[in-house]
Regions:
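Conserved alpha/beta cores of soluble small-molecule-handling proteins
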Residues: 1-116
Length: 116
């Protein structure tokens, strides 16, 4: 059975999730990630991890891909969809996709994906 994953606001079977080859996360590792423990279908130390994600995004001058509240709803929906009682949730945010260039501006639309 395929897992449900989250990509840019949508939930889908893992086999349908596609990230463009020109995404800066792939080309330049221009991304941040955070790992969340899951226990009793709840996120362990949620605030700690979200604060660390905030710090990491800030260090790379990357915007949040969505509000913290919306991200929490997405993560909890993902946990429920995959019936994850104990485990791990991986979340990654990239600067986004555009033609390959070392330079970037504030116009990028971040890519966000997560899976359990």
């Amino acid at each position: 059975m395929e897992r449900t994953v989250f990509l840019n606001g949508d939930f889908m079977p893992e086999g349908e999730a596609k990230v463009p080859i020109f995404d800066r996360g792939l080309l330049f590792a221009d991304s941040v990630y955070e790992g969340f423990g899951i226990l009793d279908s709840q996120i362990v130390d949620y605030e700690y991890h979200m604060n660390r994600l905030d710090r990491s995004l800030g260090e790379l001058d990357m915007p949040w891909p969505m509000s913290r509240d919306d991200l929490l709803v997405a993560m909890m929906t993902l946990i429920e969809a995959n019936k994850a009682v104990e485990g791990f949730l991986y979340l990654q945010v990239t600067r986004g996709s555009r033609d390959r260039s070392y330079l970037y501006d504030d116009d990028y639309q971040p890519t966000v994906f997560a899976f359990t």
